[in-house]
Amino acid sequence: MNIDLYSDRAKQAVQSAQSLALARGHQQFAPEHILKVLLEEKDGLSRALIQSAGGRPDQLDGGVETLLAKTPRVDGAGGQLYMKPDTARVFAEAEKSAKAAGDAFVTTERLLIAIAKEGGEAAKLFKEAGVSAQSLETAANAMRKGRTADSANAEEGYEALKRYARDLTAAARDGKLDPVIGRDEEIRRTIQVLSRRTKNNPVLIGEPGVGKTAIVEGLALRIVNGDVPESLKDKKLLSLDMGSLIAGAKYRGEFEERLKAVLGEVTAAEGSIILFIDEMHTLVGAGKGDGAMDASNLLKPALARGELHCVGATTLDEYRKHVEKDAALARRFQPVFVSEPTVEDTVSILRGLKEKYEVHHGVRISDSAIVAAATLSNRYIADRFLPDKAIDLVDEASSRVRMQIDSKPEELDEIDRRLVQLKIEREALSKETDAASKQRLENLEVEIDDLQFRSDEMTARWKAEKEKVGGAAQAREALDRLRADLANAQRAGDFARAGQIQYGEIPALERRLAEAEAGDTQALTPEVVDAEQIAAVVSRWTGVPVEKMLEGEREKLLKMEDELRGRVVGQDEALEAVSDAVRRARAGLQDPSKPIGSFLFLGPTGVGKTELTKSLAEFLFADEAAITRMDMSEYMEKHSVSRLIGAPPGYVGYDEGGALTEAIRRRPYQVVLFDEIEKAHPDVFNVLLQVLDDGRLTDGQGRTVDFRNTLIIMTSNLGAEYLASQEDGEDVEAVRPMVMNTVRGHFRPEFLNRIDEIILFKRLSRHNMGDIVRIQLQRVEKLLADRRMALALDAEALNWLADKGYDPVYGARPLKRVIQKELVDPIAKKLLAGEIEDGGVIAVGVTDGQLSFGKAVLQ
């Protein structure tokens, strides 16, 4: 025996067989050890060979196991192993038959045939399993298709298509492919290219998620249904799995050998096989190592001669980046562009897929959910493509409903938790002997009995509902299988079976399903996916509130001005304009191609421009920090525009993205504040033009960022001198022309023309100060509340602070400084000195024109 003459797989089999013999304590290395290892091969090559020769591999395996169990065990033999004469004859026979067939290497199937001929006891097992050496040899020759074993990994090339490709036509025949709706034009164009004499290789090019792979699956379904021209009838469509082709190819040349074997089988099929290569750009450079040839170069000759029918699929970017660079490869393929379907087409696609998802999740999907998935995904999910994003929405919403059905209902869960608490309390009270505890125990018993009754009733109801949903799910699955059987029976011409399914079994199942679905409307858990479930998933993905508004939220929105007035004083016109924009958006009546609203706030310093923006963020998101604030004084240079949208290619920071675009990509629904807008460089306004007009902005990496769900607010002090010079109570509209002249002198007309509303903020009057003092004091009280302390200011103290803090030029900001200096600082000193204790009320009044602090009154 010359081990160098054996292929890698055969060497491995012999070594594993020796290890098996030692592990079982056998002193003799017998043919049955080799047979056992061959039957346990990972890819089952020997088993497949026995099966195709008409044998029973499981019976053979059982016989080998019995034979090995009878072999005497020797413990402590020190790992000595002797070759049985039968084994030597097996190796000699394998080498002889390999030489006779012109093979350079002995392969695993030669060993299998040799065991069947010369294996002694093991050879008898083959006869019992219904297979002879002759039938095995015939099956091996059929599997090899006339090829000789001229390399150490020759087995890798056997039945290469079975190993490295998936039969799409077989999957279509078994009903495993999703139905393909529409896309007739693209499928027709693909068929036209495939029917050419040479260069008959279409490549489907389109954005990710538009349905390129689905078009090929649609072609497979059409081939199975015979809905193709004569030239494509009875063809097989196989999908090449590049992953398994490359996986495990350790040595140089192994990958090329596998690919050559695949191409050889396709060529030998003489045009009856069409190869589909998904993610075609992976071919370019695949397998390329030191001096090795990459996959695309191996394909080119076969493609050019028309021997290889191939359909590729790749995205526009990958095609440009990888395939177009290789002009020789690109010219052998004919591009077929796949565009994104419209919302109407997406609705049709979803209606066709609905049944498959209903069967998988065991829930019902309403038509309103399908329409909502198409429209909401198109509007709110900007960085992905239809129909993929709409299908994902339906899938996730269905999974959510299924999870709710399988989980315990919230109401029942609360009752069960309360029961556990009460039972623990009962155990504790049962040991007490006083009258109060006994009374409490009696009350507990009554409450426990009541809750237990409700829990039992609800549990029984929930389980019954679950069973009903389970029954409906089983009926749907059976219906799906029957429809696939019906299609197969019609194709095979078995019209008796087709009639039985169509007019007997399917109607009976449909009746059963209708009964199961005619459920009670007061179900504990929802069984139907509707538009609201879809909206909830969209909200989770994007943060945009698109669910149906609850009654409380409606009330809140209608009284929005009153809420905001709690923080911003004396600017009613501004509050109204902003509130109207938010209400428009939540009622779904805003222009879908523009931001929720864009405002320019003009007014003197300290009148509440930035404060209104913060209070708006708190009102909408219950979080003052839910705001992207751009201080435009940082964007005074021309080059600072790149900080907003990201650096261009070739510059440092290209991968990081822009400050503005990244913030909106992560959180599409928020308030964007451009503070002190007039301080920015004029080029910054050019960037904002498309944001204000189309609600979108393209960042440095070419990605489109969606601003349609943002509220854009810009603040400025331009023309503030006119507003500041007004008398108390004077209408701001009187000075609007002068203010607008100043604004027009600074901003371009095309920028101003795109802003929804330019709002003038009034100068704060003295009578506004009382409300502002109260708002500012609330913040101080909040800080004191942590120490269980409270403030009590009398009317005189409030007036004193308002007078002292009022400055018509600087607005409310001086008041903040006055409160800090005259109120907070003295309290801080008294706290540190121990004059005020925690848990007291600090009484503040006015004495001799200054604030005075009374002794803390203990609560």
Swiss-Prot record:
Ranges in a coiled coil: 391-522
One GO molecular-function entry: ATP binding
InterPro entries in the cross-refs: AAA+_ATPase (IPR003593), ATPase_AAA_core (IPR003959), Chaperonin_ClpB (IPR017730), Clp_ATPase_C (IPR019489), Clp_N_dom_sf (IPR036628), Clp_R_dom (IPR004176), ClpA/B (IPR001270), ClpA/B_CS1 (IPR018368)
Gene Ontology annotations of biological process type: cellular response to heat; protein refolding
Region called Repeat 1, residue ranges: 6-71
Main location: cytoplasm
Annotated binding of ATP 1, by residue: G206, E207, P208, G209, V210, G211, K212, T213
Subcellular compartments: Cytoplasm
Chain spans, region Repeat 2: 83-146
UniProt region (Linker), positions on chain: 341-543
Keywords: ATP-binding, Chaperone, Coiled coil, Cytoplasm, Nucleotide-binding, Repeat, Stress response
Complex and partners: Homohexamer. The oligomerization is ATP-dependent.
Role noted for this protein: Part of a stress-induced multi-chaperone system, it is involved in the recovery of the cell from heat-induced damage, in cooperation with DnaK, DnaJ and GrpE. Acts before DnaK, in the processing of protein aggregates. Protein binding stimulates the ATPase activity; ATP hydrolysis unfolds the denatured protein aggregates, which probably helps expose new hydrophobic binding sites on the surface of ClpB-bound aggregates, contributing to the solubilization and refolding of denatured protein aggregates by DnaK.
Protein name: Chaperone protein ClpB
Gene that this sequence comes from: clpB
